[in-house]
């Protein structure tokens, strides 16, 4: 058993540094025809500042993103576990192409159970736009696109009680970035067409079985990774790129996803 455990841990270290880099076509109800084919690279959960093979996954994902040259890049929180990762984070963000938007996560503010986490003083992330209960209007392919992002404390109710519905504006496409997937349960229909989230790491350590797997982190969570739909809109939950608590993944490979939006 000790050999089996060592082999599993060894593979977990390898898996944590080998991101899946994939394209996913995503039907979005209400998407204007002009935005059919719009490409968004969704990245999440870098967790920089602690030793982890996840750093390799982040580096590889950023290089891949730069080569894809999408219309938009979205980063949905937990950029840092410790402030010491900030210089690397800034170098990585400078390599990302086109408009890039990001939000913070609970690890960025150290409102997490992770004993390694320390709060960072990240207030801006130029050339990316760091959103905190605010949004920005931009024009893509001749249509107005509204990108909004939440402060992660919105769902912890620590220091802010912003209603995510209040962040919506009129636009051809409205996108909400929130670290926590359960924001979908708070949204009213017609506020946002697309929600992008992270946080879950697809369990980070999972036990596969035929037809599925048991996620050891958040085993009963309604949103783990992938695409979810409700009356409030369409949500993509990223498996993320880094690690927390322990520096490996098992049956929960890190991922960078290029979403190709399609009119439903």
Predicted regions mapped to residue ranges:
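N-terminal membrane-anchoring alpha-helices
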Residues: 1-34
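Soluble catalytic domains of enzymes that build or remodel membrane lipids, polysaccharides, and related
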Residues: 34-43, 48-264
